[in-house]
Structures are given as C-alpha cells and as structure tokens.
Amino acid sequence: MKQALRVAFGFLMLWAAMLHAEVRIVIDGGVDSGRPIGVVPFKWAGPGAAPEDIGGIVSDDLRYSGKFNPLDRARLPQQPASAQEVQPAAWSALAIDAVVVGQVTPNPDGSYNVTYQLVDTGGAPGTVLAQNSFKVNKQWLRYAAHTVSDEVFEKLTGIKGAFRTRLAYVVQTNGGQFPYELRVSDYDGYNPFVVHRSPQPLMSPAWSPDGSKLAYVTFESGRSELVIQTLANGAIRKVASFPRHNGAPAFSPDGSKLAFALSKTGSLNLYVMDLASGQIRQITDGRSNNTEPTWFPDSQNLAFTSDQAGRPQVYKVNINGGAPQRITWEGTQNQDADVSSDGKFMVMVSSDGGKQHIAKQDLVTGGVQVLSSTFLDETPSLAPNGTMVIYSSSQGMGSVLNLVSTDGRFKARLPATDGQVKFPAWSPYL
C-alpha cells in the first residue's frame, strides 16, 4: 500500500494545477443479476462527521464492476463494525454470503487508520476471508477505499481489482486561450488534474504500460504530430511529425514499441517505432486505409481497422511479416478495437442497422455481444482487468463518457459540466 501510494502521489502532486469540474458517475443501468453483497458504512471513531464515506466508495466500486449487487443501506439488517459483531443468520436470510465491515480512526498527527474485514456469513461466526489496515492522510482516503475494493474484489472473484486505476481523456471547452485540455482522473472521475492545455485539438491519448507516460496527438504546430509526455516532469518527446496525418498511438505491452498510423505516402498505414532507438518500421501497405492499432499481449501482433474490404473491419497482423487476417464478420462495419490484456476478447465500435454501439467479441469463438445502448458510441478502452469499458458517446450537442461492464450488467455516464469529453483511455495498473 505504501509503495502504491508513493507511485500515485509522485506524478499527481507534480502535476497539481487548477482543477475544473469533475466528471461523476451517474448510474443508467443496474446490476440486479450481480452477486449480492453487504457493505456496511465504516464506523467513524472521531468527532463530528467522517471525512469520507469509505463504505459508500467500496459499495460503488463493486457495483460499477457489474459483478456485484450491494445491498441498499436502508435494507442492511445490522451495521456491525467488526467480524465479531456480524450476525450470520441476519445476512443469510437476505441471500448475502459476504459482508464488508470496517472502521476509520483519526490519529493525533492528522492521518487516519482505515481497517476492514471481509466476513463470510456462510461459515462459522466471525469467519474472516480478508482483512487489512492502512494509515493514510486525508487526501488519500479515497485511494484507501479503492484499495479495500481491489482486495475484496480479487478475493471474491479471483480477478485483480482495477479501482485504483485512472482515466486520461480530452475536454473541449467553449472559448478561452486553451480550449483543449488533456486530463487525468481516478477511474470514477474524482481527483482530476490537467496534463496539457492547448489552443489546438488534442486527440487519442494512450498510456505507457507502466503508467508513467501518455502518447497523444497534438495540432499545436499547425498539423498533426505524435508526442509522448512524461507525467512526473511534463517532458514532451516528439515522435512523429510527417506530412499529412500522424495519429492513433498505442504502446506495446512490453513498453518497447509504439504503434501508430501515418499517411505520409497517401493512404493511412501502420508503423511501429522502437522507442529506444527511434527506428520506424512500416507494417502495412497498399491503397486501403489502415489505422487504430491495438496490441495483443505478446507485443508482436496488432489488431487494427482497415477498409480493404470496402467498409471498415478489424484485422490482425504480425509486425514481423505476413498478410493481415480479418477477424470481424458480424455487422456492416467494425472498428477502433481494444484487445484485452489476456488476448481472449476485444471491444470495438460495431455498426449495424444504422446504429453504432460498443460490442465485445470473443477472439476464440468469434461470438459478439453488444454492450452499449447509447448514441454514436466511439473510442472504447478496457480496464486492465477486462471487467469494464470506458467510451464516449454523443449526448445532445456534445460528447460524454460512458462506463459499461464487459458482461453488460452495469451501465453509467460520467458527464462533465465544463465541456465535451472525448478520447478516454484507461490506465494500466498503477
């Protein structure tokens, strides 16, 4: 926990800036089919009101994953603060087999101790499945809550939690000297900060696999350029500034390469740069447009969008040679894919019957599931554990971010009050 806090604190504090209105999750679809779980409000052991609702944050995290359906607080049969106080029969009567309890205690030095226990209500009374304690300053209480969520989620699902991750996205405001901002926030929209301001458009942020850098497209020179910015010190490295279009950056999972699309020879084609040497290799060629690369876990294969068959579809190509292979066949067109970290599935923008939604395709069976029901959905980005997708959609005259679980159970919006929000990118584990 301490190491994780140091890493997160390092670039967050160095990039402290005037913060704008935060995006917030607004629930559109419930998770009635998720696993029932009890999350009790954490007992506050200090004077006045608690500085953060830790139990509420944990409950929200678990609900947003789509895998859990936390019991409404009004229906909690009791409000224990420790495993010893949990009455298993009271919870079992509500089909709850796991309960999260905890306490928040202030310290004389201004810090807080956050403790929690995950209690098995189906076993012997007081059976604890997981527990931990964290000492944090006030500004890190939400982070401590997300840590509780991560540990509970992993214990109950076997999947690593992704609640301490972040989102990068572009906000376009009306007017001002710098109407375009690249921002980073917690995955749920809290604690945003500005990475870069620009008078010209910013597009397509992409995280490095260690979470220390963002690649993105900027038009500040009067034409598109690809840059990589280090979050800790703000240093910017220009990596591509060729004639015509430079876009769609994607770091390889091993961190050694950057894939992107260039149209310097006419049509859009894929290129890969070795980041250590700066050497660039062309991966695709021909008259078709090839863009929007996303890496497979082996750092040797790319999925990408191509119109070589007429309409955009998703293809796979090995960067060391070989002909691209088409991998999408359902719908009139499919594009802008993001491959899961285990390589078992991908999410993409799928169009059919005049509708454009986010869909999930199993890369083994080829089965496709439509996940979203919003309007003109774009730019999906997977959480590192593959359980959630962030994407943008049109709402009214602008764009907003949306969240959907990859099982389709949970849907939410992350509206911003100060502009259009586009190009979301989910960070790796931090």
From Swiss-Prot:
**GO BP annotations, alphabetical order:** cell division; protein import
- Which SUPFAM superfamilies does the UniProt entry name for this protein? TolB, N-terminal domain, Tricorn protease N-terminal domain
What is the residue range of the signal peptide feature? 1-21
Q: Name one GO cellular component term.
A: periplasmic space
| Keyword tRNA-binding belongs to the record | no
Keywords, in A-Z order: Cell cycle, Cell division, Periplasm, Signal
**Localization of this protein:** Periplasm
Q: Which domain of life is it from?
A: Bacteria
Subunit and partners: The Tol-Pal system is composed of five core proteins: the inner membrane proteins TolA, TolQ and TolR, the periplasmic protein TolB and the outer membrane protein Pal. They form a network linking the inner and outer membranes and the peptidoglycan layer.
Outline what the protein does. Part of the Tol-Pal system, which plays a role in outer membrane invagination during cell division and is important for maintaining outer membrane integrity. TolB occupies a key intermediary position in the Tol-Pal system because it communicates directly with both membrane-embedded components, Pal in the outer membrane and TolA in the inner membrane.
Which family is this protein grouped under? Belongs to the TolB family.
Indicate what this protein is called per its UniProt record: Tol-Pal system protein TolB
Q: Which gene encodes it?
A: tolB
